[in-house]
UniProtKB/Swiss-Prot annotation:
InterPro entries named among the record's database cross-references: Spore_germination_GerPA (IPR019618)
Name of the protein: Probable spore germination protein GerPF
Originating organism: Bacillus subtilis (strain 168)
An example Gene Ontology biological process: sporulation resulting in formation of a cellular spore
Protein purpose: Required for the formation of functionally normal spores. Could be involved in the establishment of normal spore coat structure and/or permeability, which allows the access of germinants to their receptor.
Keyword ATP-binding on entry: no
Length: 72
């Protein structure tokens, strides 16, 4: 069944998915992985971080997390 979509204004998109109308199959067109230590991803004003010993596990036993094959 077709969808009727009205006027749309998108100023900015970062790391998201926008769908218009009917959607059957969604899959990312790119992927990435990062490992951050304790408190490394914090943002904002006046941060106070009290971290003791930190050990981030970088071991990843699987070969592929999400395949990119067939994504146009």
């Amino acid at each position: 069944m077709p969808a009727i979509v009205g006027p749309i204004a998108i100023n900015s998109i970062s790391g998201g998915v926008v769908n218009f109308g009917d959607s059957f199959y969604l899959s990312p067109k790119s992927s990435s992985k990062s490992a951050l230590g304790s408190g490394a991803g914090n943002t904002g004003d006046f941060l106070l971080l009290n971290n003791a010993v930190n050990a981030t596990n970088y071991i990843d036993p699987d070969v592929n997390d999400q395949d990119m094959v067939g994504n146009g």
